UniProtKB/Swiss-Prot annotation:
Gene3D superfamilies (UniProt xref): 3.30.420.40
Role summary: Required for the formation of a threonylcarbamoyl group on adenosine at position 37 (t(6)A37) in tRNAs that read codons beginning with adenine. Is involved in the transfer of the threonylcarbamoyl moiety of threonylcarbamoyl-AMP (TC-AMP) to the N6 group of A37, together with TsaE and TsaB. TsaD likely plays a direct catalytic role in this reaction.
Gene Ontology MF, one: N(6)-L-threonylcarbamoyladenine synthase activity
Protein name from the UniProt record: tRNA N6-adenosine threonylcarbamoyltransferase
């Protein structure tokens, strides 16, 4: 049995300031998890404003760490290490977290472990369910969407991903186009519950192409045109129009994710895992219809389906603390030269996705 380890985790890659304490002994235990969201700060702008997010992180990070330690009933001297998100993400927030972690590590002499934010999501099933490698992971969030085969704490193979917008980003933009509050995921899902998903013939992008790559920007454009068509005809949209638009959009996202997951499972089957498993993580994994569809796809393929509790789907520091423990046990640790990285692909060997931009692959 591995020696028990207790780690502090720090997360500040987007618009959630978070700190947590996780202990790994015979089983993993989350001793505390503090998340200070910034939704109210960004709501007037219809999306996350990087400068506002960075300032909020700088103001709140130390308070979150103090609270996480208090709730865990521990002091810095009771820890075995400090894990921090070192990327990818909005660079101002990531830098704030890395600088705080460096200061704590320097002052206490504790090991410092930089964590890839995506690895935090991808390793969450091992925190919650002690899932064995290898497993198939669908990471689906506001900034990322990709299929990964997780083979180890730092060994991931990407099978495909979104070449443009991530689903969470598309949900947020849909909410903004329809005058719904942010974050868009819960708002669109709630509105879609009373809508007719068959009213609008929205496209299912890239289902006519082989492989596991996806695209969601065209779906967002189709919704914009449908909305504008209603406005041109009626002079505005009714609540039912809005519900139908949300239902049609959500159904299209569900169909794309379900079919691409079938393809990814077929590739993953070649791994011959003792217990085939499909895990899903990221904020969009909290969407009920998406979870239900992926559950059915996994059952059809004879795979176990795992999704973390909703509080661990969205950004949190417990997953960062756990990923730090995993990396530390594998021999990974960092010095004071640890750098904040806006882009940091999990699979360094995979070719950049088409939408990666001039600065390189995001994930």
């Amino acid at each position: 049995m591995s020696h028990p380890l207790t780690f502090l985790g720090i997360e500040s890659s987007c618009d959630d300031t978070a700190a947590a304490v996780v202990r790994a002994a015979e089983r993993a235990e989350i001793l505390s998890s503090v998340v200070d969201g910034q939704a109210a700060l960004h709501a007037p702008f219809g999306g996350v404003v990087p400068e506002i997010a960075a300032r909020a992180h700088a103001e709140r990070l130390d308070l979150c760490v103090e609270r996480a330690l208090q709730e865990a009933g521990l002091g810095l001297g009771d820890l075995d290490g400090i894990a921090v998100t070192a990327g990818p993400g909005l660079i101002g927030g990531v830098l704030s977290g890395v600088m705080l972690a460096k200061g704590l590590a320097a002052g206490t002499g504790l090991p410092l472990v930089g964590v890839n934010h995506l690895a935090g999501h991808a390793l969450t099933p091992r925190l919650t369910d002690a899932l064995a490698f290898p497993y198939l992971m669908l990471l689906v969030s506001g900034g990322h969407c990709q299929f990964l085969i997780a083979r180890g704490a730092e060994a991931f193979s990407r099978l495909g991903g979104s070449i443009d917008d991530a689903p969470g980003e598309a949900f947020d933009k849909t909410a903004k186009l329809l005058g719904l509050p942010q974050p868009g995921g819960p708002s669109v899902e709630a509105e879609a519950a009373t809508g007719d998903p068959r009213r609008f013939a929205f496209p299912r992008p890239m289902l006519d192409r082989p492989g596991c790559d996806m695209s969601f920007s065209g779906l967002k454009t189709a919704l914009l045109r449908a909305r504008d068509g209603i406005v041109a005809e009626k002079g505005g949209i009714t609540r039912q129009d809005r519900a139908d638009l949300c239902a049609g959009f959500q159904a299209a996202v569900v169909d794309v994710l379900a079919e691409k997951t079938r393809r990814a499972l077929a590739i993953y089957a070649e791994e011959q895992a003792p217990v085939p498993a499909l895990a899903v993580a990221g904020g969009v994994a909290a969407n009920g219809p998406i979870r239900a569809a992926l559950t059915r796809v996994a059952e059809e393929a004879g795979a176990r389906f795992l999704a973390p509790p909703l509080r661990l789907c969205t950004d949190n520091a417990a997953m960062i603390a756990w990923a730090g423990i995993e990396r530390f046990r594998a021999g990974g640790r960092d010095g004071m030269d640890l750098q904040a990285r806006p882009r940091w692909p999990l699979d360094q060997s995979a070719p950049a996705l088409i939408g990666s931009g001039r600065k390189g692959a995001k994930a």
